[in-house]
Each structure stands twice: as structure tokens, then as C-alpha cells.
Amino acid sequence: TATRGECKGTSHWVDFAWDNPEVTFADILEVFGELPIPPYLNRDTEESDKETYQTVYSKIKGSVAAPTAGLHFTPRVLDALQEKGIDLEELTLHVGAGTFKPVKSEEIEGHEMHTEYISVNRSTIKKLIDHDGYAIAVGTTSVRTLESLYHIGVTLAENPYATEEELRVKQWQPYEKYDQIPPVVALQKILGYLDRNGLETLHTSTQIIIAPGYNYKIVKAMVTNFHQPQSTLLLLVSAFVKGNWHTIYD
């Protein structure tokens, strides 16, 4: 059974209950859930989408939608990139349902960003530190993850013993911190945190909203698709190109 609970902003808590302890919530979603696809496809979800509407490198279940920029990367393309000496690193962001939520408020301050869970391996963070060239993010999911790393590092620079709750990136946090540090230093702070806690992977969450006025710290280039009007992803792109997104879309 599903029972609607407390209302929080434009969202609701929903309580799920079932009798069989051997059945997981993931099992229930597989049976009763429907894979969400972008509205611009103008069609219903098809059974084949479970296989074809996925990136070839996806491994961990948890997102409500595929990171669509990654759909363009076939095994052949990935092999060609590596043959050219381009290093490929993987990270995880579990895309939240809020990725489909348009901005309806008059001012961006009135939009509540969704929380997404991220995981980044120590080896990836170390490569970002040692890498002299561009860090190219594939998709806005990777952008949000990489940029969140910087702000996690800023938190650790202020408090090396920050709790898991304190490491979570809040929506407006990037715009409230004025004592900035170099990206390499921020990433080194994360490595120090992993060392102190005997961890190989950083697990946390982010509510970051990237909008015009945001100063990118780690991402130097990105691969992304076109985005819907009123989308927070369009704000992210606008911030990256300093408001010149109209030229790109024209």
C-alpha cells in the first residue's frame, strides 16, 4: 500500500508498506514503476527502454532517469577516445525526480532544488589533482558532481572533521562562501578526509543549483544536450557560457 504523508513545499512524503519481508522496495518499483523518459520524446515508455535508454557504462541502480548526454557514447566512441590518450573516469550521481521539475517561480530564489546522492572514488579525485589538462564533464549530472566536490573541499578546509551531514552541499552554499581556495587544495582536503576515515570512496549528497553568477571551479568543458525551457539545466549551461546560451540555441 502507498499512503501520502506530510507535504514539504511542492513535494510529499509517501509511505510504502508490504507484507513479504523477502521483497525489497527495488523489487516493487520494478513491478509497478515506470521508467521516466523525457517529455520531448512525445511517447509512452516502452519495455525496450529498460535496455536501450541506458548508457553503455551504467552499472549501479538508483537514478530515476538516464544521464542522456552519455547515451551518445558507444563502446566504439569510448575506445577511440582512449586510443587518443584521453583518460576516462567514472563517478556516480543518482539522478533525482526533481530533474524533471521546471522553474515556475518568478525568481530563482523561489525554486527548491532536489537532493541527489553522489559517489566518487579516491582514484578519480587523485587524477583530477594530477591532471594538467581540461576536465571535461559528460552531462549535467557529472557537472553537478564535480562542482560539488569543490564545495565539499571548502567545507573540509574550514572543518577537517566535518560530519557526513555537514559535507552535504546545500542549494545556495556555493554563493555564500566568500573565502575561496584553489580547486587542487579543495580536492586535497577530500583526500585527507578519506585518509582519516579509512575510506576509498566519498559518499555524500548534493543539492547544488548552478545558475548565472556561479563561478565554475573544476569543470572546464562539458558535453550536454539541448534542454527544455524553464529547466534548471538551462541555467547551468547559461552560467557556463556566461549567459550566451541564446547564440548556441539559435
Predicted regions and their residues:
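Surface-exposed, charge/polar-rich loops and edge strands
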Residues: 1-250
